[in-house]
Amino acid sequence: MAGDLNLKKSWNPALVKNQQKVWEEEQQKLDELKRIKERNQEYKQEQEYLELLKLQHGDQFQIKDLNKQQKLKISKLNWMYDDVPFEGNEKVEENSSGFIESNVEFTDGKSKVENLLKGNHVVGKKRDGSGTSDRINKIIGVGMTKSSKVSYSDDPLLKIKQQQQQAQRVARKQHPSDKHSHRSRHSSKSSSDRVHKSHEHERSRKHNSSHTRHKDGSPHR
């Protein structure tokens, strides 16, 4: 008895490829619904914040009447002005544009130089082995996880290169006499070649002299 011929039809819903298409469309609709909910939540939060501003400044308030942080929050630009957390003993100043200013970069190392000039060998700030200050390391490390900081050491190509260099160093340490033996063999070969050439030259000189005496009629001994 022949099987179900409907399984050979491309429109059959029992086929795996058709079920996969249905599942993918359902996932797309779920993602779209999730994005719509997120936008509605953001809009709701904005409306609540505007209601709070109306209670604080009145119904007819204008943007110019708000302070700096409120303007940035309404325009959704406050995340651009979030600076690195400063050290406890560092003085924080803000300019008219809302940027945080610090004079630590200009005065960094001043106390150390003054102490050296006075004869007091006291290190002013703690530094690491590379010579960079803690503040610079803090700024560089913002937004980086522990795994991302050590990602450079996990580079497979770098590891392969290091292994090759290590193998070359070990080979040079294990066979230090190969180079000298090669030089000695080369020097012995060159000296033997010079001796052989000198013998050939001596034989040719004797042969030429005997041939000259034979032409002159002198008796050949």
Swiss-Prot record:
Record-linked InterPro entries: CIR_N_dom, CWC25
A GO biological process held by the record: filamentous growth of a unicellular organism
Region feature (Disordered): 145-221
Residue ranges the record marks as coiled coil: 14-56
Assigned keywords, A-Z: Coiled coil, mRNA processing, mRNA splicing, Nucleus, Spliceosome
Primary site of residence: nucleus
Record carries keyword Mitochondrion: no
A GO term from the CC aspect: spliceosomal complex
Region forming the signal peptide: none
Pfam family of the protein (one): CWC25
Function recorded in the entry: Involved in pre-mRNA splicing.
Subunit (UniProt): Associated with the spliceosome.
Family under the similarity heading: Belongs to the CWC25 family.
Protein name: Pre-mRNA-splicing factor CWC25
Species in which this protein is naturally found: Candida albicans (strain SC5314 / ATCC MYA-2876) (Yeast)
